[in-house]
Amino acid sequence: MLTVKKKKELFRIIALCVAVISILVLPFAVFGGRLKNTGVFALSGEKCIDFGIKAPVNAAKSAIVIDARTGNVLFSSNADEKRGMASTTKIMTALLAIESCDPEAEFQIPAEAVGVEGSSVYLKEGEPLTLRELLYCLMLESGNDAATAIAVCLAGSTREFAEEMNSRAKELGLKSTRFANPHGLSNDGHYTTARELAIITAEAMKYPLFREIVATKSHKVRYNGVENARHLTNHNKLLFGYDGANGVKTGYTAKDGRCLVSSAERDGMFIIAVTLCDPFPTSTHKTLLDAAFDSFEQAELALEGEITAEIPVINGESAFVKATNAESVSLCLPKGSRTELSLIVPESINAPAVCGETAAYAVFSVNGKEVCIINLETTASINEKKKSFFEKIFGD
């Protein structure tokens, strides 16, 4: 997935390089399919699409449901209000740990991680655990001691680790999120929004290890060196009774209330839901996820090779080169939506042309909003036309 910054650079390149844009608008019927990301990027971050549908009635102070693959917003309610996030903080803790360290690296539990306030897996000073084991302790039992151990082992202190969490949030383009610790105990300088927590979660779900851990109902790790002696149970009730549920994290403090981030896959759709300060999070998430699966579908936009453009080639052995989409494309859209396809095609390209190069773009729109852009790649290499004896001497 391209970052917002890279997308802006891409649009600038298109504006500079495309002298003449030819637009072809065609209606595409919507039907089920599966997303393939190669050569395709949805408009995310600042360009993320919000379908403008209010979340179903629920008791949460803030709520949002997004398409995990694109970040497009399916439903939301007060999604940009800053709130405490309790132990859903640990999603960022896990993300940062997975990105910065070998999961099989073994650590000795530091003294700072023993007896930490709140939920605990009762770590003992000096006991050996791998990062993988600590991550299971972190995400299943929500161990604040595990969060502290990860922070101290990877960054030297919880304070330094929190600063790294803030740097990662900044990289993700988040402007309303700040971390003061790795575990989520209430702090006035520790907050996020439902929207930005959903973005963090979508980023974390890109990693197979993270997905594996948050989908696990129960697990065993070492306890003070004894294999499989520490029994862990996931606190996320949705994993035990909701069809397709595969993550991610619960949270609670007296100040922040009950927080929950959940995810589920069904019928080709991959959905993330977030609620902050909700007295009935499990019930709310069932309602939100049901509404998403009932109202949206993974819509097939184009089969592989279905979108084509012919581009004139200057000084080429062939006068034209064909460009097409190398992968099929599907997107999570409201049921019954119809899309428009616009082609961005240069007036011409110069030889030589290399097979597989991006030469044009296809833009899909729903109700006038651009929802994804697809690279159209050349299907053949075109060599530069050899000049005749007279052309070499006298020019064209």
Per-region residue spans from a language model:
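Generic detector of short alpha-helix boundary/capping microenvironments
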Residues: 10, 14-15, 51, 58-59, ...
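Short, compositionally biased leader-like segments
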Residues: 25-42, 323-337
